[in-house]
Amino acid sequence: MRELPLVSLITVNYNGLDYTTELLNSIRSFSYAPLEIFVVDNASVVNPEKILNQNYPEVKVIRSEKNLGFAGGNNLALPFAKGKYLFFINNDAEFTSNCLQTLVEFMENHLDAGVVSPLLCYFNESKTTTSDLIQYAGMTQVNALTARNKTIGEKERDTNQYSTAQKIAYAHGAAMLVRQKVLKDVGLMYDKFFLYYEELDWCERMRKEGLNCYVEPNARIYHKESAAVGASSALKTYFLNRNRILFMRRNKSSLKLIPFFIFLIFFTIPKNVYTFFVRGEFKLLRAFLEAVKWNVVDINRKIFSKKVNYSMPRDYIFKN
């Protein structure tokens, strides 16, 4: 049997130590070897280093003194990651048997793949038991006019309808296995997104370098969706809308952006303003308008960077 390659598992914690420990316990239950584990703490109110070091000595903890967001937090661990593959997983997710091995074997047999995600299923509403309700079995391409796309299989009952690996438009940031060489060929995740759309942007850049994105449904992860961010919070409204526009700016040509901006100005903005106002959701309305404003102010700034930058902020702490 071929020797399994080293995998560097990276998860980001932000005021969610209970979720992080549940993830680490599930990793112990369904171990893959060889494996190195990194927990990046994104400036949680209570520093979790002591607890993690005492109870999970195999875990390497990286502490940032400011919240760097999803991409920035994950990127912080990359200079220390030695694995042939990098497994990015949300701390509000849990492992299943042979998940990581199945993903690694897929990558070993598909050299065109830059990234592969497992099938994602929801926990039940109490977040205490798993369910057969699918969250993700792939994603379609982002529409050039609306900047929206579809999550394949979302909220379907799992009846084994997704049983073979498929080429897809985008991996899911909650769980994705990436080749280490992607960092050199494509670059890091773009940390300006902070929250949402980072993996979609990364997948677009991978495709431009000739690498494909896949889903392998024979590997499964359970995800406690919205455990970290409220389902209709102002935070989520702001970053989803801000980053949807930023994604289009980064990945579409000037010619293709013309119909998108026409649709945005004359349909998307009026529709959202009207909807939030009629519902009395004034915090969400303000968040939406701030998202649009951010892109107007940011429009002339440089938004493209391929170079891999391993320089570290001064405020990181690395613990063996």
Give names to the regions the model predicted.
Residues L23, R63-A81, N91-A93, T102:
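Glycine-rich, basic loop-to-helix element that forms the pyrophosphate-binding segment
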Residues V46-Q54, N98:
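Acidic helix N-cap motif at the loop->helix transition within catalytic regions
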Residues Q166, M176, Q180-L195, L200-Y222:
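Catalytic donor-sugar/metal-binding loop of nucleotide-sugar-dependent glycosyltransferases
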Residues L76, F95, T102-L188, K192:
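Acidic/His-rich active-site region of diverse nucleotide-sugar glycosyltransferases
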Residues L235, F239-L240, L255-N320:
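Non-catalytic, C-terminal membrane-associated alpha-helical segments of glycosyltransferases
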Residues N25-P34:
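Short, acidic, metal-binding catalytic loop of nucleotide-sugar glycosyltransferases
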Residues L35-A43, I62-S64:
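Short beta-strand/loop segment that forms part of the nucleotide-sugar
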Residues L86:
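Short aromatic/hydrophobic "clamp" motif used to bind/position activated sugar donors
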